[in-house]
Amino acid sequence: MNFGNIDSDLRRKLKHIFIVIALLLPCTGVFAQYDKDVFFFRGRRALADGKYSQAIENFNVLSRIDTTDYWTFFYRGIAKYNLGDLRGAQKDFSTSVRLNPVFTSGYHYKAITESRFGNYDKALEDLQRAIDLRPGYIGLYFSRGVTYFLAQQFDKAVSDFDKYIRKEPKDPSAYLNRGASRLFLQDTTKALADYNKAIALDRFEPEGFIRRGRLYASQHKYADAISDMNMAISLDTTNTFAYFNRAIMYYEQSDYNAAMADLDRVLKDEPGNALTLYNRSLISAQVGNYADALDDMDRVININPGNVLAYYNRASFFVNMERWQDALEDYDKAIELYPDFAKAYMNRSYVESRLGLNKESKRDYDIARRKIDDYRDKTGSGEASFADTTKKYSSLLSLDADFAKKDFDDEMLQHRDVDIKLRPLFRFVLSDKRDNVQYALKNRYENPLIDKFLNGMAVPVVITNSDTVRISGTDKFMQAIYSGGGEKGVAEFQKALADVADKQFNSAQVHYDNAIDSDASDKYAKLYKVFYYMNRAVLRADMIDFISSIENNVQTLTMDDQGTTRARVKDQVSRSYDYSDAVEDMQKAVEIVGDVPYVYFNLANLQCLSSSYVDAIGNFTKAISLYPYMGDAYFNRGLVLIYLKDKEKGCIDLSHAGELGIEDAYGVIKKYCETNNGE
């Protein structure tokens, strides 16, 4: 059994309880400023409505108004927690207890966050501090019980759940968690009693039936187990975990059709669920359908290239299909991943003999015998015992909680609902109206040169990296743009902006060229060329991206020598694109004016596209030094750091980005920054 279920209980419980508790907590002190009251109310209201990013925005403002208000950091920590930003939440909860060392709720929530990182000793210390401050707050015992469970101190977990249940005897979650703890203490009788009690308290919650059904299955009471899964599914027809478990139960009853139907149902909702694909592959092979078995196992390997069982079993499919060379490659990979895999050596020996590689076959056979003998000497078991241990390599797998989700996310490199890309380049664009610079507490970037440049335009122009800037059409601007007044460089620049808005990219580049080549009539005209180079660089990069998008839509299929399409990394064709002209333009912009953060941000982005990641990090850092509230720069630098395997720093940057209003950051944090502990 995995610890994931009880943790998922906690997370689900927290989703509902975190906000309720937070909003019921007393808020002391009277704010001196009306604005502070307004932002505080808006932040708490957003929390109650589940609008966590909006809540963070309001608490950000409060944190700048008053850096000593521990409630502000506490509430912001709750919002970050619910967005998956555990590091950011941990930092805010730590700040809340630093500002108020007797803040019970701060220690409580800090402990919960620590436990998600697997820092159970620290979590238990924080919970003990909270209990010392408020021994009568019963919810602390529930949280500490969960933490003890995760720390594998099951007897202490039972003790804390006992205390909680004495005060809250009608909370089914407590019985479910105590039952799970008792299972690990091998007390199946009391565990079953707890599951029965949880079901009696809430017969409309499928989790109780799933837990009890799995317990019945472990006792080989499959009829009772399937009955409980049927009940769970009737309560929640979208509960894929119930279908998954029922499939294994049907399989144990040799009802392969029913098992396959349930696995198909899981994959309908979660088409990339690696564990379900793996199990379906094994059943397909067992009934002789090797084509479907291969399709599923290929996907498992694509999702998780380090899965030794997938290579081992796919090799056996190839053996049954007499595809000896393919089988040999997979046994090679399985042994590479698991050098002590005696059964793989034995099977590879057989494949090598079929390929006429007699010397290699004899060598592998001897290695296999030696490993079996070593195993027997260490365990005191005979070959029959060894044979039994190998059964697990070709039997269905079962896993608790979010079964295999972390693995199958890797296949797509992004969540289905989260677009993990660099934040785009900044540029000047036409707009229906000019920027409103009267942003109170919005940390707007102010640069006198940019402001003068924009104010001198004949038409509304803004600088942005968003595609949501409204422009109802360029016709209304044409007279002002082509009136012939003003400095030539600015006039050509405005014409280029109009062409870009109308998607006349070649014409736009000509106008940018003219703006850059124009004579500088005064010092400002010379400095304005930083913006001309910047926008031309962006245009050049966009044109390259457009070409690459067309070429990448043409897919290449590679066939092996037996006519079977194989999806392997080595078969994929990639092409790099030359951004050197765009990079050169951006570097010239830096040479003209060296304190515009947007230019350094754009240069860093282009360096990423050119695979110059270390240089890119330096320029993102420069952009941040010039504009510390540039969330986009934190976001992109975080992605690059994660790509370069500096995950800790990358996740800190993403947390800053989310705090600064980049909502995409929280989707990336959930994908890359949540640790294995607590998942």
Place the predicted regions along the sequence by residue:
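Eukaryotic alpha-helical solenoid repeat scaffolds
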Residues: 320, 342-524, 542-581, 673-679
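Helix-start (N-cap) detector for alpha-helical repeat units in TPR-like alpha-solenoids
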Residues: 35-37, 70-71, 104-105, 138-139, ...
